[in-house]
Amino acid sequence: LPEGQQQHPPAPIGIPLGAHVIGGNRCEFRVWAPSHASVELHIVAPREQRIAMTRDAAGYHEAIVDDCGEGTRYTFVIDGRERADPASRLQPDGVHAASEVVAGDFEWNDKGWTGVALNDYVVYELHVGTFTEEGTFDAAIAKLDDLKELGITAVELLPVAQFPGTRNWGYDGTYVGAVQASYGGPRGLKRLVDACHQRGMALLLDVVYNHLGPEGNYLAEFGPYFTDRYRTPWGLALNFDGPRSDDVRWFFVHNALQWIDEFHIDGLRVDAVHAIVDHSAEPFLQDLCEAVHRRAAELGRRIYPIAESDLNDPRVITPIEEFGLGFDAQWADDYHHSLHTLLTGEQDGYYEGFPPLVSNLARVLKTGFLYTGQHSSYRGRKYGRAPKTNDGAKFVISMQNHDQVGNRLMGERTAALLPPEKVRLAAAATILAPFLPMLFMGEEYGEKAPFQYFTSHSDPDLIEAVRAGRREEFDDFLWQGEAPDPHDEETFRRSKLNWSLRSNAEHAAMWTLYRDLLTLRRNTPALRSLDLSRVETHADDEQRVLLVRRGDVLLAFNFSDEQRVVTLPFEGAWHSLIESQATIEAGEVTLPPSAFGVWQA
C-alpha cells in the first residue's frame, strides 16, 4: 500500500499464542499487547524469574525460557500489574490468579477417528457441573455407555472456558482457551473426548465469541480487543471490524483451532452469532468457518461449525462460495417455540409471535423457519427470510435446551410442565422430524429437577447486579414468584440431575420410548433422509392434528385433549412401526388424546 495507508503491520496469522512447551524442557511464551512498549514475563513457580519479553512491530511480545515445563505458573506484567495469560490453557486458582503451562503429551486412543456424518447427528446437550453429582469430566465418562445405548451420536458441552468460581453455565468465561479447573482441566477434557471417540460419538463444544464475562476480564488492558462503537446485551462488543481487528480475529480463530488440534473436538457451537457486530466485507464468522473447514480437510476429519442464531437469516448456513457465512448448521428456535406453545398455550414474552397452531409447526417442518419475512408482533417488524436449502441437516431442533429451560423464572423442564403423555408426544415429534434432534440432559428419562441460572462471583456489587438483571429478564413474561438467587449454592444444587429416577418405572418407560424412537429414526430409510422436499404435511388447526408424510412413512400427532378421527389425505396400505394406541382403518386415523402414531406403507 502507498505510504501512510498501512499504519500497522498485518497480523501474523498462524503464530501460536500463549505458552507452549517446545522440547528440551523449554517453553515459548507469546502475547499480543500492542498498547505496551514492554511486557515482563513473571515465572511464579517452581522457580521465580522475571524476564523481559521481546516486542515485534505488530505488538507481539515473546520469550523463550529454559528449565520450564508443564506445571510452571506464570503471569504477564503490564504497567506493574500482574495479569494472567489471555491465551492461558489452565487457571488452576481461578480467573484472578496465575496461569499454568500445559504440555501437549496426552496418550490418545482415537487413531483413525474421522468423526460422525452430520446427517447422523443426534445431539445430547449437557452442563458438566450438573450432569453428575461430582460435576467433572471424568464423572461424565461413566455415563457415556448409557448415552451410546440410547442412540446418542454427539455430546455437546456447555462452555468450559474458565469462569469465576465453580458454579456457572459457562457464558461468563474470561479465558477462552483455559479449561475450567474445577471440571478437571485440560487433561480431564481430553479424557472425555477420547472416551466419546472410542464409543463412536462426536464431542461438540459451545464457544462464546460475542462477549467475555465481567469478572476476571483483563483483556482490554492488553490491547484493542473491544470496541465502544457497539454494545452487546453483556457490555462492550469485541473488535472484529475496527483498527487492529485482524489480530483480534486471529486470537479467536486461534482458539477455535486449539480446540480442534489439542483436544480433538469435532465441532463448535458458536454462541449467539447475532450478537457479533461486524460490518467487514469478509466477516469474522466467515474467517472462523473457513479456518475450521480448512483444518478439517487437512486432518481428514468431519468437523462442523454450528451457529446459534435468532436472525432467521439463511446466509448463516449458506456456503462461503455462495456468499454466506459458511456454518454447517444452526439452532432453529422456531421449531421449539411452535411446539412449546402448542403444548403449553403460553403466549407471553417471545412466545407472543407463535400462536398455538399445528399449521405453524407444519410450516417449520417444511422450511426450518416459521418466520421467513412476515411481520412479527413480538419484534414489531418483518422478520426472517426463506432458506434456499432443502437439507434438514442444516437445522438443529429441540423440545428443550439449556436456554429454554434455564431462562424460565423457575427453570422448569418440559417434564415438570406437562403430563407424561404430552412429553411423549413432544419427544416423538422432535426425534422423528427431518432435522438434527438435540436432547437436553435428563430429558430422556423425564428428569423433573429444574435447571436454574447460577453463578459464583466474588464481587458483591456484581452479585447484586446479576440478581437485578435476572429479575428484569422476566418483565415480558407473566410468570409469578421470585426468581431463585443465582449466587445461592442451593440454586446450583437443585439443578443437578437425579440419576436415581432411572430405576423408577415411569421414568424407565420414558427412557425406553426415547431409545425406541431413536432406533426407529436410525433404521428407517425414510426417517434417515433429511430431504425437506420429500416432506408432506396436512395440518388441521381446528382439530389440532398434524399428519406428516416422509417418503413411505406416515406420522400422526394429536395435540388436542380429545380423541380425533381424521380422514387420511395420503393413500397406502399402512402398517404400524411402533407400539401406539393410534390406529388406521378404512382410510381414517384414530388418535386418542395427546397420542401419536408411526406407520409405513
Feature names for model-found ranges:
Residues 27-34, 557:
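Short edge beta-strand/loop segments characteristic of extracellular beta-sandwich folds
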Residues 29, 39, 559-572:
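Surface-exposed beta-strand/loop patches in extracellular or lumenal glycoproteins
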Residues 33, 70-72, 586-601:
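C-terminal beta-strand-rich structural cap/linker in extracellular carbohydrate-active enzymes
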Residues 285, 289-476:
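Conserved alpha/beta catalytic core and glycan-binding cleft of carbohydrate-active enzymes
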